[in-house]
Every structure is written in structure tokens, then in C-alpha cells.
């Protein structure tokens, strides 16, 4: 992978490289290859991902057809870039779905 450095601006080039790597899915693949995944676990994960994609596609289709209400967009600047920032218990080690 290659990125041009313009005017010795390394920060901008690094940002562009990270963006390219994110688009290519390199970070995700590194995370998956960080440890061994049994074939049965891989199969289960891929099946779950396929189900998730199908549900998302169906939900989007229903929203386009007007059968489901559109998800309200947050006000500009509200909780941008902070997953799980809104909601109760988000600061006490709870994930986006709450404590487990």
C-alpha cells in the first residue's frame, strides 16, 4: 500500500494511510488473525455476520418503503465519535448494550 507525502506533511500521509487500510479491511483482518480461530468458530462467526447483514438489509428496505420509521439523526455534534456515550450507565464500564 502506498501513500504520497506532500510538503513533508507526515501526519496527513499517516491519516490517509490509516483510511486506506480501514477501507481495505486490514485492521479487521489483523484482529481476526491475532489468534487461532477454530474452523467451527469461524463458520459460526461468518454465519452470524451473514444473518446480521440480511437483517440490516431487510430493515433498510422496510424503511425505504415507509413501513418502518426512519431512525432519527442526532443533532450535529451530539455524541459524535463516542459509541455508547448516550444512555444510562455508559460511564461505569458498561458497553453499548449495558452491563452484562
Curated annotation (Swiss-Prot):
<dbReference type="InterPro" id="IPR001911">
    <property type="entry name" value="Ribosomal_bS21"/>
</dbReference>
<comment type="similarity">
    <text>Belongs to the bacterial ribosomal protein bS21 family.</text>
</comment>
<dbReference type="GO" id="GO:0006412">
    <property type="term" value="P:translation"/>
</dbReference>
<keyword id="KW-0689">Ribosomal protein</keyword>
<dbReference type="InterPro" id="IPR018278">
    <property type="entry name" value="Ribosomal_bS21_CS"/>
</dbReference>
<dbReference type="InterPro" id="IPR038380">
    <property type="entry name" value="Ribosomal_bS21_sf"/>
</dbReference>
<keyword id="KW-0687">Ribonucleoprotein</keyword>
<feature type="region of interest" description="Disordered">
    <location>
        <begin position="37"/>
        <end position="100"/>
    </location>
</feature>
<dbReference type="GO" id="GO:1990904">
    <property type="term" value="C:ribonucleoprotein complex"/>
</dbReference>
<dbReference type="GO" id="GO:0005840">
    <property type="term" value="C:ribosome"/>
</dbReference>
<feature type="compositionally biased region" description="Gly residues">
    <location>
        <begin position="84"/>
        <end position="100"/>
    </location>
</feature>
<feature type="compositionally biased region" description="Basic and acidic residues">
    <location>
        <begin position="37"/>
        <end position="52"/>
    </location>
</feature>
<feature type="compositionally biased region" description="Basic residues">
    <location>
        <begin position="53"/>
        <end position="62"/>
    </location>
</feature>
<dbReference type="GO" id="GO:0003735">
    <property type="term" value="F:structural constituent of ribosome"/>
</dbReference>
<protein>
    <recommendedName>
        <fullName>Small ribosomal subunit protein bS21</fullName>
    </recommendedName>
</protein>
<dbReference type="Pfam" id="PF01165">
    <property type="entry name" value="Ribosomal_S21"/>
</dbReference>
Amino acid at each position: 500500500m502506498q501513500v504520497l507525502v506532500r510538503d513533508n506533511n507526515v501526519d496527513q500521509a499517516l491519516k490517509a494511510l490509516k483510511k486506506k487500510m480501514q477501507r481495505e479491511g486490514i485492521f479487521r483482518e489483523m484482529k481476526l488473525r491475532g489468534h487461532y480461530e477454530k474452523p467451527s468458530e469461524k463458520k459460526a462467526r461468518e454465519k452470524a455476520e451473514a444473518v446480521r447483514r440480511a437483517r440490516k438489509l431487510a430493515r433498510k428496505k422496510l424503511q425505504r418503503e415507509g413501513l418502518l420509521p426512519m431512525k432519527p439523526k442526532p443533532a450535529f455534534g451530539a455524541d459524535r465519535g463516542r459509541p455508547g456515550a448516550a444512555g444510562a450507565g455508559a460511564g461505569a464500564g458498561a458497553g453499548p448494550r449495558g452491563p452484562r
